[in-house]
């Protein structure tokens, strides 16, 4: 099916939002201009809505294989489509781990059969993510590994991490890291700060993250490797990454919507839906993350979509698993709490969720360009509604944002020119 989107707006190559029509033919963007006419195309009047590149999320947990009670490739990618994401990068903490030819081939087969959006799988750095035996990077790359990570745990052995970085550098691939020094975790379930002290809980100190990042940055410099830091959460981490960039080290970083929007002061009670890793930090950490995003220290926004069952989250804050679901709330949360409040511009938000993650990892997506695959999201910036987990397409309903009133919602998502999700009556 060919589509002609009329009376829209889009972010042009100069970084300005302007009026446009957009023609999709044979799965690709055929033309971007005003007053397009075309035969054999279904005309869709978007009535001033924003025609955006499909959003790109480089940090997601789809749980399949092994955790299908939490999420599946099918439900997770439907949730991604509803959230406006057309390309997502799946972390390897599944069972089995994509750490071998057999396991990666099985994962790719599942993706091909079940995914509603583009899914790029990470390859594990170590076998079973156990930290002791390196995987075959060359084979995993040949089978489509997006990059290498043991996300969910930090690689504790410095010699292992250095060897992994050297091997990845030879393959022109990135090493992506969840940064925690295990000896400093302290069996924590929240940030070591006011909230942990008030409720008598073990806390995870900020230095647990920043010291691991500092180590890895020096290793990356020695290996001349592209090193990407997952879900940065502390002021100290931002400072370390900023200094590394100034020194010319090839480091990039991401931050989550929840760390930009919340801090420990916003946790209302010992609610496990506010339990994530890294935890919500102090107010000054939150402010440093926003500053780092604005000055280029932090490159992109990624959701760290981490679905769990209601039963798992009901175990209490100390026993419940870390993580919150993120696909279906990311854009409206960020638009409402950052753009509408004047903290960042709409143009910046679109870039942090599209072209910047694509550029960081060399992906040919993230921009609306003639001739490229028609991965597109239509956004209604005027629409306002409350976040309701019962409407999530994800199996995971675990969110701290239930009941939040947000503005700016995806209403249609196309992948390769095919409509994979549409809000009922959104464009009527």
Swiss-Prot record:
Annotated positions binding Zn(2+) 1: 59, 61, 151, 304
Cross-referenced Gene3D superfamilies: Metal-dependent hydrolases (3.20.20.140), Urease, subunit C, domain 1 (2.30.40.10)
GO cellular component: cytoplasm
Enzyme class, first EC level, given as a word: hydrolase
EC code: 3.5.2.3
Keyword field: Hydrolase, Metal-binding, Pyrimidine biosynthesis, Zinc
Catalytic reaction equation(s): (S)-dihydroorotate + H2O = N-carbamoyl-L-aspartate + H(+)
Annotated binding of substrate, by residue: 61-63, 93, 277, 308, 322-323
Cofactor detail note: Binds 2 Zn(2+) ions per subunit.
Pathway given in the UniProt record: Pyrimidine metabolism; UMP biosynthesis via de novo pathway; (S)-dihydroorotate from bicarbonate: step 3/3
GO molecular function terms listed in the Swiss-Prot or TrEMBL record: allantoinase activity; dihydroorotase activity; zinc ion binding
PROSITE patterns on file: DIHYDROOROTASE_1, DIHYDROOROTASE_2
Superkingdom to which the source organism belongs: Bacteria
InterPro entries recorded: Amidohydro-rel (IPR006680), DHOase (IPR004722), DHOase/Allantoinase_Hydrolase (IPR050138), Dihydroorotase_CS (IPR002195), Metal-dep_hydrolase_composite (IPR011059), Metal_Hydrolase (IPR032466)
Functional description taken from the UniProt entry: Catalyzes the reversible cyclization of carbamoyl aspartate to dihydroorotate.
NCBIfam families: PRK09357.1-2, pyrC_multi
UniProt protein name: Dihydroorotase
UniProt source species: Bacillus cytotoxicus (strain DSM 22905 / CIP 110041 / 391-98 / NVH 391-98)
């Amino acid at each position: 099916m060919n589509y002609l989107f009329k009376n829209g707006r889009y972010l042009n190559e100069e970084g300005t939002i302007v009026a446009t029509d957009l023609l999709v033919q044979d799965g690709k963007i055929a033309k971007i201009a005003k007053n397009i006419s075309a035969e054999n195309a279904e005309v869709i009047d978007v009535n001033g809505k924003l025609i955006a590149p499909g959003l790109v999320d480089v940090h997601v947990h789809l749980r399949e294989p092994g955790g299908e009670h939490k999420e599946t490739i099918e439900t997770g990618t439907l949730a991604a489509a509803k959230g406006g994401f057309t390309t997502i990068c799946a972390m390897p903490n599944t069972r089995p781990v994509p750490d071998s030819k057999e396991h990666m081939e099985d994962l790719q087969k599942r993706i091909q059969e079940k995914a509603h959006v583009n899914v790029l799988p990470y390859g594990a750095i170590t076998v079973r993510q156990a930290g002791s035996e390196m995987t075959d990077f060359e084979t995993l790359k040949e089978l489509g590994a997006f990059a290498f990570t043991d996300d969910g745990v930090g690689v504790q052995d410095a010699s292992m991490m250095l060897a992994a970085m050297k091997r990845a550098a030879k393959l022109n691939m990135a090493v992506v890291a969840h940064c925690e020094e295990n000896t400093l975790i302290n069996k924590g379930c929240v940030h070591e700060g006011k909230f942990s002290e008030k409720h008598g809980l073990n806390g995870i100190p900020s230095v647990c993250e920043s010291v691991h990042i500092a180590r890895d940055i020096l290793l990356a410099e020695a290996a001349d490797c592209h090193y990407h830091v997952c879900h940065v959460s502390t002021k100290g981490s931002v400072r370390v990454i900023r200094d590394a960039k100034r020194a010319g080290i090839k480091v990039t970083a991401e931050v989550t919507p929840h760390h930009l929007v919340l801090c420990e002061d916003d946790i209302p009670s010992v609610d496990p839906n506010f339990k994530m890793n890294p935890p919500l930090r102090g107010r000054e950490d939150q402010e440093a993350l926003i500053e780092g995003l604005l000055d280029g220290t932090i490159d992109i926004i990624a959701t760290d979509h981490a679905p769990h069952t209601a039963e798992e989250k009901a175990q209490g804050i100390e026993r419940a698993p870390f993580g919150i679901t993120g696909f279906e709330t990311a854009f409206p949360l960020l638009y409402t709490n950052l753009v509408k409040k004047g903290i960042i511009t709409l143009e910046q938000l679109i870039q942090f969720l599209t072209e910047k993650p694509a550029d960081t990892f060399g992906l040919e997506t993230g921009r609306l360009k003639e001739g490229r695959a028609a991965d597109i999201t239509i956004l209604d910036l005027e629409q306002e509604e409350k976040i309701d987990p019962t409407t999530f397409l994800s199996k995971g309903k675990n969110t701290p944002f239930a009941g939040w009133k947000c503005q700016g919602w995806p209403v249609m998502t196309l992948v390769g020119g095919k409509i994979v999700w549409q809000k009922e009556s959104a464009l009527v």
